[in-house]
Amino acid sequence: KDDQQKVIDDPKAVSEIFNKFFTNIGTNLSMALPPPKTDFRQYFDLPNLQHPKFDFHLIGVQEIIDILKSLSIKKSTGYDKIPIKALKDNKYSLAPVLAYIVNLSIQNSVFPDLLKVARVKPLHKKGDPTNCSNYRPISILSAISKILEKILAAQINEFFEENQIFTDSQFGFRKCRNTTGAINRLMEDLYINFNSSKITQGIFLDFSKAFDTIDHDILIQKLTFYNFTDNSKDFIKCYLSNRKQFVQINHANSSFLTLK
């Protein structure tokens, strides 16, 4: 449905409606949130200031080869229409070129704009199929973008693990940790408290569009606290800014919009 609640069936028009809706989700939710009553900086763990500085480092050809081997060929192609299978099949000849591009990006703290374009496919979750809010946006990125992202994420994770920045209670987005481990930890705590005749209370939260509502300014300030260098912060700022997307319905594409 459009803004006047009129049902639209033209694929091009539908793609435009979806794109406008998806690109404004984070902003609309953030504006609806009440202003914080406390300064977020008071929650920082001050001992973390003792660890060394973090900066992205250059990578070798073998690292590119290993990443290409790990990519699934079942993933759809992104905006650049470069299939992952083509990269994997030619990994030994393409790895030096890709390593050069990645290292140039790291040296200049620039994430290329063409790698920040997402092709979005709406996936119906449940409920009224004419209501945009009942769809989940599936963003399909460039295969080369995924390679660069994996490299950056691996370096950040390694730094956080080595310097024990992650709380031991975090199980998501960490190697050798999963939901099973989180449940086991919970059950262990419950068992210990039960045997000690203690009362246990739990709070379970499901944040709506959590990643879409992250305040990038606060994120960068947290990186400053964790001793990220100016170059590394500039790189992440570049990665987060000027991201564009278009929605594809059948074979009709919307215009490009910048994520807010």
PLM features: residue spans?
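Alpha-helical recognition domains of nuclear gene-regulatory proteins
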Residues: 21, 67-70, 85-86, 101-104, ...
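Conserved short loop/turn motifs at secondary-structure junctions
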Residues: 81-90, 170-175, 204-210
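Surface-exposed loop/turn segments and immediately adjacent short secondary-structure elements
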Residues: 1-134, 139, 143-147, 166, ...
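Electropositive, glycine- and tryptophan-enriched low-complexity nucleic-acid-binding patches
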Residues: 150, 157-173, 255-256
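Conserved pre-motif C helix in the palm subdomain of viral-like polymerases
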Residues: 26, 133-162, 181, 208-211
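Conserved polymerase palm-domain catalytic core
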Residues: 207-260
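Conserved catalytic palm subdomain of right-hand nucleotidyl-transferase polymerases, strongest
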Residues: 74-82, 120, 131-140, 181-224
